[in-house]
């Protein structure tokens, strides 16, 4: 059975860039990887393929949602390091339910038998929305992973995601592997001080620290992974992903988080420095 990861975090926190580089690192460690983008923007896998690929919803719409007329090749495309990629897509802006599309994508995965083909499946999930459809990847995941940075809004969203994982863990096998600290800046951003206090409070840990570096910004613009980039800082930027990949492949320590109440976290974060 595949190791299945569901990656969440506040909108704009860098989930797609982080997920793509983690998928690349897992592949470079020898794993056969499928990354699934669960966002109507359908740009999750851009860094792996260098293009915006057709989405599941695009393909299903063309065949009037007759699943039997869709092949694996219609929706799965191979990117850097042999990582296979799939974009679920979503309805037009202002209409429909994006969560429904995630459900359709999961259904297709089962019909294609893809869960048995891959060593690792990575779900890159829309923002901090954890309504029914967008929380569906947690039903299938071994581990949830939260991406956050060292600020209030990010930590508030992370706490809500901890609540979703806790609720899902009562019925499914999923637990929280930990938090990936993104855009870590020890000079201007306080490093990971707040995140470390939050992680300890809810009973988890930081599993990786990704620096705030211009190489990461440029890689996203160019549609490349960090492993394909050249220039100062490459090793600093790629090392955290290789370290996380190694730990995840060896099944990391995980927990069922103990989230704070919304009002409580407002009070608690205000007391952290």
Swiss-Prot record:
Against Pfam families, the record matches this protein to:
Fer4_NifH
Query: What does it do?
Result: Component of the dark-operative protochlorophyllide reductase (DPOR) that uses Mg-ATP and reduced ferredoxin to reduce ring D of protochlorophyllide (Pchlide) to form chlorophyllide a (Chlide). This reaction is light-independent. The L component serves as a unique electron donor to the NB-component of the complex, and binds Mg-ATP.
Q: Where does [4Fe-4S] cluster bind?
A: 97, 131
A molecular function (GO) term: ATP binding
Look up the EC number in the record and give it.
1.3.7.7
Co-factor note (free text): Binds 1 [4Fe-4S] cluster per dimer.
Name the cofactor(s) required for activity, per the record: [4Fe-4S] cluster
User: What is this enzyme's catalytic activity, as reactions?
Assistant: chlorophyllide a + oxidized 2[4Fe-4S]-[ferredoxin] + 2 ADP + 2 phosphate = protochlorophyllide a + reduced 2[4Fe-4S]-[ferredoxin] + 2 ATP + 2 H2O
Report quaternary structure and partners.
Homodimer. Protochlorophyllide reductase is composed of three subunits; BchL, BchN and BchB.
* Gene Ontology BP annotations: light-independent bacteriochlorophyll biosynthetic process; photosynthesis, dark reaction
Q: Does the keyword Transport apply?
A: no
Q: In which pathway does it act?
A: Porphyrin-containing compound metabolism; bacteriochlorophyll biosynthesis (light-independent)
Give the similarity note: Belongs to the NifH/BchL/ChlL family.
- The name under which this protein is listed is Light-independent protochlorophyllide reductase iron-sulfur ATP-binding protein
